[in-house]
Structure formats: C-alpha cells, structure tokens
C-alpha cells in the first residue's frame, strides 16, 4: 500500500519494547511504500504504547500533535537509582525502601501534581551546546539542564508492591507535552530519601489518540491501513471552520482570511469537507500554520 495513493494520514502504532521510535518509522516506510513518514513524540526503546505516525502529507501535522497532552502508565521502583533514571541504566545506589509507608508514597506523588518546575532527565533529547543531552550523559559527561514548567493533571498511585527490599509503585499520569516520566520517578525517590527509577512505561494516549485504536506493527505488515485519513486526523485534533467557496480558493493560494473567533489552531474545511489548511486567527487576519492542499498540488 502506498501512503501517497491515499493522500496520507496517520497510523496509531502500539510500539513494542526494544525498538526506537525511528525503528518504527523505518518499518512503516517499508509497509506503506513511501519515504515520507515521521512520528509525533519520541518513546524510549524500553517504552511501549501509542506512537502517532504520519504518512505523506500528514507528516505536516506531527509538530502540532507532538505538543498535545499525553497519558501514561508506569512503574516506579523505589530504593534504587540508575545512570539513566530507568531500567536500562547501570545501578548507581541501592537503599532499603521497605520502611516507606503507603501514606508517604501518596504524599510524595501528590506533591508533584499541578504546575511544577521539572528538571528534565539527563538522558533526554534536549540539546546542550548543539549535542543531545543523552549522548553527553552516556559519554560520562555531567549534564545540567534548566527546569521547565510542566503540568501534571493526574498522578495517581494504582498499586504498591514490596519485593526484595524495593517498593514498586504502579502509577497513572496525565500530563502536558514536555513532561518526563523518568523525572517524576526520580523526584518521588528523592522526596522519600531512597532514590527511584522507572522500570516500565506505557503511553496510553497522545492528544485525541489512544491505545484502543493502536495497531501492532505485525498487524500493519499483514494488512497496511491508516488509522485516520488526513482530513479525519485534522478534524479530530482541531476545531473546524467551514469555508465558503471564495474563502477556500483564497486559502489554497495562501491568502489570509477574516478571523473566525476560534482560539488556537483550527482546521479550515472546503465545501467538499476536505481540510485545506490549519489556520490561526491574528488580530486582523488569519495566518497559515500549515497549508495541506495548496493550489499548486
């Protein structure tokens, strides 16, 4: 199946453990027969779950979809720190944690809800002096990253298990884009004085798109299919503005329109229902965020 043949769209992939997000993109290029493939929001190799993959023209949406809220299920191990703040790193320190009470864990988790200033993980993809932080960290260099304001709408303890001197805490997280779940695990451990790292991470939602519509890669290889067409993806993710024929013609040629009074980015739909562009209101005129179907197409 060629992604170009259907005008592009998005595929919700259930990423397996052990693959990088780029590996998934490579596999989808072969499955859909096009080089024009990208993803919205990197998942580490150990992580599983929702990876939004854009095919052909839908790759233009990925930067906007990356910035949407996300949901995760994770397991935090208290009593041990690692070099990467997850199970893939080397153990740095082990501290008996079985004396930590459920109430103490609950308080430490609750303290990280709401808007917080979070120091990203040292093995994040943030650039430091032109180099990715994770590359510098894995070379043994000390990486210091500035705190960033993030929003944690939900940070809930689902289960607590005490095993071999450790405490494993299953949690659910709803958060803004840019939140590092590894950093939450680290900070809970710091608060409790025993250290902590992430042992499991599964992304359950990116914006509007959840696990309930995610395909395993093997299923896509057997039967290539889009989760949503380009138009569906736009209309599910953004408010809709219906254009008149004259407005549609102006939009195709990149000309600004009168504002619609819609907050944020919205989908500008032609009379036939196809989405021509993603627009944003300015004080006097609209501005084009992404033109999906220009007059030259």
From Swiss-Prot:
**Record Pfam families:** TruB_C (PF09142), TruB_C_2 (PF16198), TruB_N (PF01509)
Q: Where are the transmembrane segments?
A: none
Q: Which domain of life is it from?
A: Bacteria
What Gene3D superfamilies does this protein's entry cite?
Pseudouridine synthase (3.30.2350.10), PUA domain (2.30.130.10)
Q: Which organism is it from?
A: Mycobacterium sp. (strain KMS)
Q: Per the record, what are the reactions this protein catalyses? A: uridine(55) in tRNA = pseudouridine(55) in tRNA
* Alphabetical keyword list: Isomerase, tRNA processing
UniProt GO MF annotations? RNA binding; tRNA pseudouridine(55) synthase activity
Family note: Belongs to the pseudouridine synthase TruB family. Type 1 subfamily.
Q: What class of enzyme is it?
A: isomerase
GO BP terms in the entry: mRNA pseudouridine synthesis; tRNA pseudouridine synthesis
List of catalytic residues: 44 (nucleophile)
As recorded in UniProt, its EC number(s) are 5.4.99.25
According to UniProt, the name of this protein is tRNA pseudouridine synthase B
Describe its function: Responsible for synthesis of pseudouridine from uracil-55 in the psi GC loop of transfer RNAs.
